Every structure is written in C-alpha cells, then in structure tokens.
C-alpha cells in the first residue's frame, strides 16, 4: 500500500490562470472560427465599455492581418480614455480582475476574465506577448504583456515611452494567434461586428479584413448611452456568504446600519420586522413535533409572524436576544448569524428591487440600428418594463423586429445580452426557446424559415444568468422566458398590422388595374350610346376609380388604427 507522503508527492496548487490555460474552451476558445471571434469580442467589448464609461462616442477599428496558415494578427484600436500605466498588467495579465466584476452593475463583461483570457490564448498558441499601446493624454506607453500563469499575474517583458504632442488618448492592442481561421460565416468576426453595430448605433466600427477590404459600420446615433448605475443587492437575491463577506468589509458600525445601508428595500422598520422573523425561526426549530413545525413554517410564510411568536412562551426573551444581534459590530457577525438573516429574508416580503440602474438600448435606437445596417422595409421595437428573476435580480427585455427590404429570405435571430452579440450555443438559449414558442402564423408569417424576418432580442441585467463561462447562452429562467414572449408578441402584432395593410394594398392595386383595364371598352360603348366624346367618358371613369380607391384606403387605415 502506498504511503500518504507518496500519494501527495505530486500535489500542486493550481492558479486561476493555469486552470483556464488548461480549460480554454470554458472561455469560448473552441474551434478555429469561434476562437478568433472570441478574441475580437473580448477586445471590442473592453473598448465599448471604456468609451461609454468616459462619455465618449466610440470609434473602434479592428484589423485582421494574415501572417500564415491559420496564423493571424488581431489589432483593435479605440478612442477611449486610455489605461493608466500602473494598471496595464492588471487589465491584460490578471484573471478575475477588472472594474466591474465586483460591482452590482449592468455591464458587457461580468467575470473579469475576458481580455486577459484573450492575451493568454495568444500566448499559448503563438508564444508571443501582446503589444499594448495606450495613453490617457500624457506620454504614450508601449508595452508587451505576458501572463505568468503560475502566479496569475501579468508581466511586462518590454516597455517603451513615447512623447504625445497631439494629446492622443485611447488604446491599441495587437495579439498574435495561431490555430484560428477567418471566414465570413455567421459565427465569424464580420458577423459579430455587424451585430455589435446594430445594438450599438452610437458606435462607429471599422473592420479591415485579411484581404485588405475595409468595411465600415457608421454610427446612426450621436447620443452616448447613460452609464448604468450601481445597485445595492436585494435581500431576496443574496446568499449567506454574500451577507457574511459584506459584513466583514462594511464601514457601518452596527448590523442594523449595515443592513439598511448596504441593501435595497431595507429600512429601520424592516429591520424590526427581521428581528421578529429570526426570533420566530429560532423558536420554531425548538418544536419537536414535525407536523406542528411544518404548520408554523407555513404560517410564517403567510406573514403571521406575530401569531407564531405568541404561540411560544417566553418569546419576548428571544426577540430581545435577536435585537442585541442587530446592534453588534458587523465584523463580529458569525456565519450562523448571517445564515439566520438570509433564512429570514426568504420568509419576508420586500418591494421589488429598484431598476433605475438598468440601461436598455431603447426602442428608437434599436430601430435606428436595424434600419442603418439591414435596410428593411418595416421595423419596430419593444422595450418591456423592468422585472425581477430569482426573487431579487432585476432584468429587462427588449426586442427589435425587421421585415423585407434588403433582408434576404430566411429567419434570423439576433441574440444579445447587455448589447453583446451571442453567436454560439443558440439551441439552449432562452431567447431561441422563446422565439420558437411563438405561433408566427397568427401574425401572418406563414413560413417563418423562408420569410425575410430578423428578430433581435436583448436581455439586460446586472447578473445575466449565462449557462457557462463562455457567456454565449442565457439560461431558461421562467421570468425571462415569459418577458421575451410578451415582447415578441407585441412586435409581431405590429408586423401583422403592416402585412395586413400591405396585402390589402396589393389586392386593391390588382382590383384597380382590373377596373382600369375595361375602361376603354366601356367609354367607347357609352360614347356611342350618349354621344359624349369618348376621351371625356374615359377620363371621368378613371377619376372615379382613382377617388373611390383612395377613399377605400383612408377608411381601411382608420380601421387599422382603431383596431
């Protein structure tokens, strides 16, 4: 039998970077086309976020340079605020680091892995460092960054400083990657940037393809989106660990002040109510009869906390004990006490979390984006009111629907999360499932797969429930699924009205032509019978037909508007 010391001889602590180096597929680096798109996605996402947070209309330039077989250089440049020199290694070389991952705020990236994952992918496929050129308005810093995977740290292997007489601000990164391919498929870089332009009409995006062709997606809006607002966590959406860790970091001097100050929808009155619920739960757990215990839990869930308390002798003593808990320093809160607080939250009723921090694209901008890129004959957009899922996480759904014009036949679903295109893993995504659940024939789209229809769905949240770390598919959460369906049906009804009018107009044009076809013969016959000039009779009937059909069109439009 092997000794324990021998079994643990190869024991090694693995860093976050080392883990993701060995499991790059978890970050979306699977397949040659997808891997290249993922690299571009991470860089472009960083650029857009940086520009918007600084209140700058984004200008993003992407260049794909072919260096050899399945060997490319990816260059992404923006006009953002730039990166301070001391943060370069953190931004590009440290996993799970960033300005957004630790905040309860809507953002394109949520995990702090993105661009550093792209740097690592370039490093493990080409062996080359990533070249970063950036300036915040002062000197231009040029640095070559690599990741020390054992330490999960970035390191600058070479750095140069250049004068900046024109005051340039922005960031340019160059990543050399191998084992990837550039193709113009619906999972490639071109399609990704096209979809990004639709959801970000305020951004000017350029792409230089490997053959040197320049493609421009011009901005169609001059308005920078308002930055999202950080939101306090809602009691219904937190875990014991959240409360415990937050308590250790807070500057509040009592648990009561901590709960009121760090969470949404908690007031002094709510803390007093929380005290009763914690006391009631402590007392219920002392009840030995399980049937009675279950009844008490049910009554507590129904809000009968005072009646539950009064059913126990000496309950006031327990209430006083819990009240003391609320006056202790938060850093002294034990795990068990944090657990009691979270358990009580589950039985209490709270107002829905505030949703002012969510920033939708907006109906007008969705329509601008779809019109500017797709050139349809009909377009509409729906932004649903904010809702919550899992009891306390705010989210919002918006939908854009485009039809006809320059759109080719065949249904296209454009999926987004916080404005970011989702190109992969569509089958399991809630957006796909919701879109496929619609009976499109009810809305005069008889053959969806052949119809020139583009449906855009954007899910907005401080915590988008992705199905994996690759962030390409949204989990099928009931509340989100239902909101998507409602938004699609609203947009589809508008399309139905348009198509009904279009079909009616085509029918009327056909009828009008039929009547006009017989006018010459009728005019000739009536001219013989009445002695009136044939041309006058003919013009009379043509005017009559024109006026009659014009009146019919006005009446039909009034009916449609009032429907």
Curated annotation (Swiss-Prot):
EC number: 5.6.2.2
Binding site for ATP: 46, 78, 99-100, 109-116, 471
Gene3D superfamilies in the record: 1.10.8.50, 3.30.230.10, Histidine kinase-like ATPase, C-terminal domain
Disulfide bridge partners, by residue number: none
Enzyme class label: isomerase
Record keywords, A-Z: ATP-binding, DNA-binding, Isomerase, Nucleotide-binding, Topoisomerase
InterPro entries: HATPase_C_sf (IPR036890), Ribosomal_Su5_D2-typ_SF (IPR020568), Ribsml_uS5_D2-typ_fold_subgr (IPR014721), TopoVI_B (IPR005734), TopoVI_B_transducer (IPR015320)
Alphabetized Pfam families for the sequence: HATPase_c, Topo-VIb_trans
GO biological process, one term: DNA topological change
CDD domains recorded: HATPase_TopVIB-like, TopoIIB_Trans
GO molecular function: ATP binding; DNA binding; DNA topoisomerase type II (double strand cut, ATP-hydrolyzing) activity
Reactions it catalyzes: ATP-dependent breakage, passage and rejoining of double-stranded DNA
Record's subunit section: Homodimer. Heterotetramer of two Top6A and two Top6B chains.
Functional summary from the UniProt entry: Relaxes both positive and negative superturns and exhibits a strong decatenase activity.
NCBIfam families from the UniProt entry: PRK04184.1 (NF003218), top6b (TIGR01052)
Similarity comment: family membership: Belongs to the TOP6B family.
UniProt name for this protein: Type 2 DNA topoisomerase 6 subunit B
Taxonomic source organism: Thermococcus onnurineus (strain NA1)
Species lineage: Archaea, Methanobacteriati, Methanobacteriota, Thermococci, Thermococcales
